[in-house]
Amino acid sequence: MGKIIGIDLGTTNSCVAVMEGGQPTVIANQEGNRTTPSVVAFTKSGERLVGQVAKRQAITNPENTVFSIKRFMGRRYDEVNEEMKMVPYKVVRGENGDARVDIMGKKYSPPEISAMILTKLKEAAESYLGEKVTQAVITVPAYFNDAQRQATKDAGKIAGLDVLRIINEPTAAALAYGLDKKKNETIAVYDFGGGTFDISVLEVGEGVVEVKSTNGDTHLGGDNIDQRVIDWIVSEFKKENGIDLSKDQMALQRLKEAAEKAKMELSTLLETEINLPFITADATGPKHLQMRLSRSRFEQMVEDILQRSMGPCKQAMTDASVTPSQIDEVVLVGGQTRMPRIQTLVRELFQRDPHQGVNPDEVVAIGAAVQGGVLGGEVKDVLLLDVTPLSLGIETMGGVFTKLIERNTTIPTRKSEVFSTASDNQPSVEIKVYQGERAMARDNRLLGVFQLGNIPPAPRGVPQIEVTFDIDANGILNVTAKDRGTNNEQKITITSSSGLSKDEVEKMARDAEANAADDRKLKDTIDARNRADAMVYNVEKTLKEHRAKVGEAEAKEIEAALEETKKTLNENDAEKINAAVDRLTTASHKLAEAMYKSSSQPGAQEAPPTDGQPKPDEKGKDNVVDAEFVDVDDKK
């Protein structure tokens, strides 16, 4: 069996590693660098460039140089408006509604572009190992959804790699950190990358890495910080010279490089100079850009972006039921964590100095290589237990979101529940799969829809539809709906979902608590309405079949209670609906009594109960079992 490589497919940079002699080794690329810029360029002559060489020519070829493609992976065109503003290349709508990159008239999918980066890393590994590489473990942000994970797997396939496992970046970092740890520790992995932010709380030690909780924001990263600096430079230059550099793509590409360089320098310096000669020209001649940026001004400029990482950290600790004092180490991942202000925020929140013993650019790839070693049998006695970041479920009657798998459930996992039809002789059911934390389905993220048809005609509530959610070790979801009566089955692998927007993540996970009271009230009302609807249906059906067994006065009393209950079905008051149902239940008791008396007469037919309960066993003529009772005096 060949070597299994570990790949960190990053927004800004990517890295590849492999296990050798029981230890992970980072593999340098063909240029001798341990990380490779996640940049792909297409020249006018048709040549394709990847990595540092592509990044170097970006200034002169901005429209055909693709970077930060990870931000478009598995996302629909309608959801990448903010990302599109941050890149000079053309992003267009694909035939299926997904985002595509248009390079000189040819449309590329994000997995295709990512595959070009993966191919370069794969070739570097093959050159280093002296053998063909066909298998890999690739990392993704913990908050990546199903479509984004699937897109990453597809990129691997396009690059000729069998992706044995997709693992979360913070989990990979914890694997690398905890490889030699003998004592048990609770750690937090704070992963601030180029395009995404993740936080995970884990327990590591004695070969076990168990994720307790995870949270994050797939629209928060170093790119946002770079963009803020670019906007500041454009604004300052416009004030001084009256020229808007944001309209010049070539100038913007130079500004992007300058902003990134200034950001990096301000991690070690208190002030930096941004110097871009001949940035543009007007009628008076060429213009040069020269300005100074202090660390304090820079930190003020991006403080709100950095603060966005604090909410997920607090939520992750709450979900893991730990306090900052119970966390033994905070491991920083991602080049952005070199920023002093981020380290200060982490120190203030977790009440300890962050761990500096790992390389934030390489630790994720190292962890992926460790997982590759586990899968290949090279690394023994290491157990990885990851979780799903958001709850998963389906829409049920009244638009309620019924969770089948709760967030932070250890994966792989499988959960089944039985549902039924909502109307008589319903020929099919539509299964709508959602991801989120809100009580109502509409407030969550729709992942996919599929139909289960050919349901035999039957009264509502009779067919048994078994819905099964199955999350594999890659975090990819499969949903199956099966009619237990016919064994007819439909299955969907959720691949049509898209990235969660900045506000949607908050709506799903962190704002769920703020909306909990309203959600609960609405859910109670719908539950009451469903109960009333079922009661009305059962009583109407029974009254129609057995009206002759009760007097006219009793029948009219039941009908009046039915009408009153029907009127409350449009109310948004659970108490009012429940009160009407109670009155209907009381009124229908007389019908039940009459049916019971009738059924006890010789030769009488057994009538169905009015409360929707299962009928007694019909195999025998009655269900009475003769038995002798012995009074036992138990003396101890």
Swiss-Prot record:
Induction: By stress conditions e.g. heat shock. InterPro entries: ATPase_NBD, Chaperone_DnaK, Heat_shock_70_CS, HSP70_C_sf, HSP70_peptide-bd_sf, Hsp_70_fam. Disulfide bonds: none annotated. One of its GO terms (molecular function) is ATP-dependent protein folding chaperone. The modification Phosphothreonine is found at T196. Residues 614-624 have a biased composition (Basic and acidic residues). It holds the Pfam family HSP70. Residues 591-636 are annotated as: Disordered. Acts as a chaperone. Belongs to the heat shock protein 70 family. This is Chaperone protein DnaK. It comes from Solibacter usitatus (strain Ellin6076).
